[in-house]
């Protein structure tokens, strides 16, 4: 029985019925239209290699705090994550300190990545915001890191001796400036208000997971990270509460 089947069976036993879902029987992947606080407790212990997610931090502090019960969720994440697993979680700048304070109670902060999307927001009464914060948490000291894939592209080829001469890549830092943001004319753009570029998900999976890993996105949105997992040959479990975004993700990943 694969992980999707185990979740489905547990949901039926607990609630007496199944949530709307799309399932790929070949890979064992599934996308559930459900509240993650209902579904996370149904996932088996130490069964997930990576949690890659983007919680809805743009809905206002009070509502966000209710929607995203940080402490309870990180307890579940710690339980379901394999010993060498990683969590990659986006956090809006106005919430990031609160997120870290709660995450640190259950997981270990391994790095703090800044995605510079170049295109800014705001600017009327404060500086233009071009950054997005991506927190990398681990469960132990045995995380996955594929050094041979940890590189970023640069605009001008390097000059130097030997292998450094003429390179168009460099070692990956924790400030990412080489990934194009989603803009109104982007081909992959859809109706989700905080959609992330597919390339971000693919980079995270390339560098910090192995092919065939089980990837969880419990705030799946329009399915960006699920598509990235599918593209990289991973099994994915997606959970999305909002029907309109669930439908977008179904069309994107299973269409």
Regions found by a protein language model. Name each.
Residues 15-16:
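Short, compositionally biased
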Residues 1-11, 20-248:
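Core catalytic lobe of class I
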Residues 247-255:
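PRPP-dependent phosphoribosyltransferase catalytic core
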């Amino acid at each position: 029985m694969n992980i999707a089947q185990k979740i489905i069976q547990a949901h039926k036993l607990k609630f007496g019925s199944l949530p709307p879902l799309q399932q790929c029987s070949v890979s064992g992947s599934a996308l559930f239209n459900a509240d993650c606080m209902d579904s996370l407790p149904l996932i088996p212990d130490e069964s997930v290699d990576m949690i890659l997610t983007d919680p809805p931090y743009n809905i206002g502090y009070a509502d966000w705090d209710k929607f995203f019960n940080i402490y309870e969720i990180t307890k579940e994440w710690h339980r379901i994550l394999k010993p060498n697993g990683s969590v990659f979680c986006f956090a809006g700048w106005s919430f990031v300190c609160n997120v870290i304070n709660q995450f640190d109670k259950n997981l270990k902060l391994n790095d703090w990545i800044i995605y510079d999307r170049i295109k800014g927001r705001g600017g009327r009464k404060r500086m233009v915001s071009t950054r997005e914060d991506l927190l990398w948490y681990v469960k132990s000291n045995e995380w996955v890191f594929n050094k041979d894939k940890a590189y970023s592209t640069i605009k001008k080829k390097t000059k130097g001796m030997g292998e450094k001469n003429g390179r168009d890549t460099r070692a990956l830092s924790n400030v990412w400036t080489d990934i194009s943001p989603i803009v109104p004319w982007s081909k992959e753009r859809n109706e989700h208000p905080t959609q992330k570029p597919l390339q971000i998900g693919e980079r995270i999976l390339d560098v910090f997971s192995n092919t065939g890993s089980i990837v969880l996105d419990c705030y799946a949105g329009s399915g960006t990270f699920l598509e990235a997992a599918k593209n990289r040959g991973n099994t994915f479990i997606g959970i999305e509460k909002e029907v309109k975004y669930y439908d977008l993700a179904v069309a994107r990943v299973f269409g």
